[in-house]
Structure formats: structure tokens, C-alpha cells
Regions:
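Well-ordered beta-sheet/strand-loop patches within structured domains
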Residues: 8, 19, 23-29, 34-390
């Protein structure tokens, strides 16, 4: 671009000179007319200010969210301020100089953008919404809050900013959230289903993911590793429009199904597939707790189990003919396990049986006198032997 080195100049009082000339003409006076000039110093050229005013990269035409209209982009100019100042210093006052600069022109013009604005569906996903009526209400409300959001090229989209505070004052109802590993009542419970559905749509649209965290436990309304939890105002889900054109997020509701579509402008026929792999699992165990409010031996499950696991996801981009262009690691999601808790009615203690009393020993009976022994019979006399006969 061109600049002229400032030079000193002279100024005169034009009104005073005009009056003097008029007087000389009307009086036909031919005397010399005095004209006094004043030297004015040339204003220094502030090239740093010029760089701030016109410098910068070229900018494409964009969508004005306030007016709903397409606005023209701008030509970008970048130059070395120090080198330009040296050229000016070496030049003569009033000399015109050529300052070396890099000029970048917008690749998307206003007329071109108006023809293709939000023409194509870049990515979409539908998830089924279940649960209490209050949870379903929260999902519908969050989906409505983000619907119609426009993100210009290079800009970020914050889910929390779009949804707003998930409080009672903001109109949300009590759903369920996980705090400390337990499901507890919480205002806005259920809004994570919308952020998760948006996340999967953004992956399929091949958008850049700036900030995303998985749930404590795996959810079943999106594929494993494709969920995105939020907790206003601390934990956010953020995506970036890394395309050359504005994108618009639009949500739909039908028969308890929430659909998120991302509209934009496709410049080729490529598409995305997400694949995942479970790399480890964490089993759960059963914990029994004795309680007094159940009949002895009766069981009641107070916490149902969840298997923990770690899953890795990849983003695979294919051309229009189905040929793989790229396969990049997307994220690793670690889901906790949760034990099964069973309450069991406490057994009532049984009293110890009383032992039978030990009987007193019976007294020994008085001994009877022993009978006298029978006397031995007296021996009979032996007869004399008879003499033999003659």
C-alpha cells in the first residue's frame, strides 16, 4: 500500500486576502498587497496506528445474529511496522512510498454466503427421552434453549451459555443428578441428554471439540464414549465451528425423541463414522447391610449395580466413495462401577435354652446284715467192711 511522508506546509488568511483584493479592485489601487503566510508543521505519520486500524487477517462474510443478515467480510493487511518506519525515515518530505504488505482476501463473500447459508445438514442424532415427567420437561426446555443458535466460522459454542442457569428461577424442574456417586434430586436433571445428543451430532459434523467430559456412569441414550455431561456453571460442553461457513443448531421433538441437527455448508462429499473399543472393565460386587425395618431374612435392593469400563473412540472420515481419509483418536472415557447394595432384615436373637436342673443324688440305702452261712453237714460214719464168705 502507499503512504506519503508528511511535509511542512504554509497557510494564509484567505478571508483577509479576499477582502484586500476586493478593496484593490473597487478602488483601482495597484499597490502591492501584503499576504502573510504561516508555516504549519507536517503531522507525524503513526504507522503503528495505521496497522491497528487496517491491519489483521482477512475475514469472511458472516452472519449477524442481532439482525439475522449476512454482513460483508474484509480484506486483511499485515505489514512490518518497524521496517515501514525505517523506509519513511529515509524518504524526503512529501515523497510517496510503497510499503510492503501481505494482502489476504476473504474466501467467502456476502453474495456467495447468501446462496449457501445453512444449506446442508452436517450432522444429526436422535435419542429417546425417558424418566419422570419433570426430567422430560427439562430435556425439552434445554433443547428449546439451544435451538436456533448460530455459530460463525472460528467461533465457539458454549452449551451452558446457550441453556442458561438450570435453576428453579430459570424454570427448570427437579430431575436426577449424580453427586458423590449417588443419584440425588437436582434442578435441571436431564439436560445432559441434550448436551450428549449435541456432542454426537458435532462428531458426525466433523466439528472441533473444545471441552467435553463423560458422565460418572455410562448412559444408554447415546453410544458408549459419545456422551457429554454438564453441570452449570462449573462443567461445560464447548464446540468450535472449524468450517468456513456459519452453522446453525436446530432441535426437534417428536414422541419423546429429541433430535439435534447441525446445519451448515458442505464443501465436499466426505462423511464421518465413530468407532469405539472397550479397553478395560471394572466389575461390581454385592454388599449386604442388616437393617431393623425389614422382617428377619427379607431382602431389599436399594442400589442396582453398574459395571464400570473404559472406552476409547475414534473419528473416521471417509470420502464420498467410502474410502477412509483419516482415522484419529477422539477421546477416552472412564466410567465408574457401582456396587449392588442389598438390605437384609436383621435376625432376632434367640434366647439360650435353660439347662435341666441336675437331680440330687439319692441317699445310699442302709446295708442289710449278711445272712449266716449254712453249717456244713456232719459227715456220715463209714460202715465197717464185711468179711468175705466161705
Amino acid at each position: 500500500f502507499y503512504v506519503t511522508k508528511p511535509a511542512d506546509g504554509r497557510t494564509i488568511d484567505r478571508d483577509k486576502l479576499a477582502r484586500a483584493l476586493h478593496q484593490a479592485v473597487t478602488t483601482r489601487c495597484l499597490d502591492p498587497i501584503e499576504c502573510v503566510s504561516t508555516v504549519t508543521q507536517g503531522k507525524a505519520l503513526d504507522l503503528a496506528a495505521v496497522e491497528r486500524e487496517i491491519g489483521g487477517e482477512g475475514k469472511n462474510a458472516s452472519y449477524d445474529r442481532a439482525t439475522g443478515q449476512v454482513v460483508e467480510g474484509r480484506v486483511g493487511v499485515t505489514f512490518d511496522v518497524a521496517a515501514a518506519e525505517k523506509l519513511v525515515e529515509q524518504a524526503q518530505p512529501g515523497q510517496e512510498l510503497v510499503i510492503p504488505a501481505r494482502i489476504t482476501y476473504p474466501t467467502v463473500t456476502k453474495a456467495g454466503l447468501e446462496k449457501v447459508l445453512f444449506r446442508d445438514v452436517l450432522g444429526q442424532y436422535t435419542s429417546y427421552v425417558s424418566g419422570t415427567s419433570d426430567r422430560i420437561f427439562n430435556v425439552r426446555k434445554a433443547a428449546g434453549n439451544i435451538s436456533g443458535s448460530v455459530v460463525n466460522s472460528g467461533e465457539n459454542f458454549s452449551y451452558n451459555d446457550a441453556v442458561g442457569p438450570t435453576t428453579k428461577e430459570a424454570g427448570f424442574k427437579i430431575g436426577t443428578a449424580y453427586v458423590g456417586g449417588k443419584a440425588v434430586p437436582s434442578y435441571g436433571g436431564g439436560v445432559c441428554q441434550v448436551s450428549s445428543t449435541l456432542y454426537y451430532s458435532a462428531l458426525l459434523a466433523n466439528l472441533k471439540i473444545v471441552s467435553r467430559a463423560c458422565h460418572m456412569y455410562a448412559q444408554d441414550y447415546v453410544p458408549s464414549g459419545c456422551d457429554a455431561t454438564v453441570f452449570w456453571p462449573y462443567l461445560d460442553f464447548v464446540i468450535q465451528n472449524n468450517t468456513d461457513y456459519p452453522i446453525k443448531i436446530v432441535t426437534y421433538w417428536y414422541n419423546n425423541n429429541v433430535t439435534v441437527k447441525i446445519f451448515g455448508t458442505k464443501t465436499d462429499s466426505s462423511f464421518v463414522k465413530i468407532t469405539s473399543k472397550t479397553v478395560s472393565t471394572t466389575p461390581w460386587k454385592t454388599i449386604y447391610k442388616e437393617v431393623d425395618n425389614l422382617a428377619p431374612g427379607v431382602e431389599r435392593v436399594t442400589q442396582y449395580p453398574i459395571t464400570g469400563f473404559t472406552v476409547q473412540t475414534w473419528r473416521n472420515v471417509y470420502d464420498g466413495n467410502g474410502n477412509l481419509i483419516s482415522s484419529n483418536f477422539e477421546a477416552e472415557s472412564n466410567y465408574d462401577s457401582r456396587d449392588k447394595i442389598v438390605e437384609v432384615g436383621k435376625q432376632k436373637p434367640q434366647p439360650d435354652p435353660k439347662p435341666d436342673p441336675t437331680p440330687e443324688p439319692a441317699p445310699d440305702p442302709d446295708p442289710e446284715p449278711a445272712p449266716d452261712p449254712d453249717p456244713e453237714p456232719a459227715p456220715e460214719p463209714t460202715p465197717d467192711p464185711e468179711e468175705p464168705g466161705n
